Swiss-Prot record:
It comes from the Bacteria. F(1)F(0) ATP synthase produces ATP from ADP in the presence of a proton or sodium gradient. F-type ATPases consist of two structural domains, F(1) containing the extramembraneous catalytic core and F(0) containing the membrane proton channel, linked together by a central stalk and a peripheral stalk. During catalysis, ATP synthesis in the catalytic domain of F(1) is coupled via a rotary mechanism of the central stalk subunits to proton translocation. F-type ATPases have 2 components, F(1) - the catalytic core - and F(0) - the membrane proton channel. F(1) has five subunits: alpha(3), beta(3), gamma(1), delta(1), epsilon(1). F(0) has three main subunits: a(1), b(2) and c(10-14). The alpha and beta chains form an alternating ring which encloses part of the gamma chain. F(1) is attached to F(0) by a central stalk formed by the gamma and epsilon chains, while a peripheral stalk is formed by the delta and b chains. This is ATP synthase subunit delta 1. The gene is atpH1. It holds the Pfam family OSCP. The lineage of its organism: Bacteria, Pseudomonadati, Pseudomonadota, Gammaproteobacteria, Vibrionales. It is a peripheral membrane protein. It is found in: Cell inner membrane. InterPro entries: ATP_synth_OSCP/delta_N_sf, ATPase_OSCP/d_CS, ATPase_OSCP/dsu. The keyword Signal does not apply.
Length: 177
């Protein structure tokens, strides 16, 4: 476990528990994702390293986020600023989304194919993954022509490489050993 995850987890867990208690999981996911993107911005990174006070940093981020953050989201950022942890917002967002997915029994799967897949193929992949993982699957699809043909699927710790490039690489490794 990385130090960032260790530091981010209590903030994410507190936000998650609050969101569940108030039936606001989707809203909190959106808020934290937006705040994460703001904090990742290069100009904002410069501001965070500038030495401003916690109050000033909170004021700046809240003004940039504008109406994307409710009062409780603003309070979370204020607490993080007071503890010098605003740079951890992306890690908190990631951890929150992990907790949300666990709670909702969902998982995101990256499907990389050599060509654009048809809807029927995506439905079949989704159904097979849902059976195998016993979770609802959200597919993130992309095309990588260097695969030559086939597909690579990544869902959590599961990696299925059924691409021609992957098969050629495995064959090459076998022949070289």
């Amino acid at each position: 476990m990385s130090d960032m995850t260790t530091i981010a987890r209590p903030y994410a867990k507190a936000a998650f528990d609050f969101a569940v208690e108030n039936g606001e999981l989707a809203q909190w996911a959106e808020m934290l994702t937006f705040a994460s993107e703001v904090v990742k911005n290069e100009a904002m990174q410069d501001i965070l390293r500038s030495g401003f006070s916690a109050d000033k940093l909170t004021e700046i981020i809240v003004s940039v986020c504008d109406e994307q953050l409710n009062e409780f989201g603003q309070n979370l950022l204020k607490v993080m600023a007071e503890n010098g942890r605003l740079t951890m917002v992306p890690a908190v967002s990631d951890e929150f989304l992990f907790l949300k997915n666990e709670h909702e029994k969902t998982i995101e799967a990256d499907v990389i194919s050599a060509v654009v897949l048809e809807d029927s193929q995506l439905v079949a992949i989704s159904q097979k993954l849902e059976q195998r993982l016993e979770r609802k699957v959200k597919l993130n699809c992309s095309v990588d022509e260097t695969l030559i043909a086939g597909v690579v699927i990544r869902a959590g710790d599961l990696v299925i490489d059924n691409s021609v490039r992957g098969k050629l690489n495995r064959l090459s490794d076998t022949l070289q050993s």
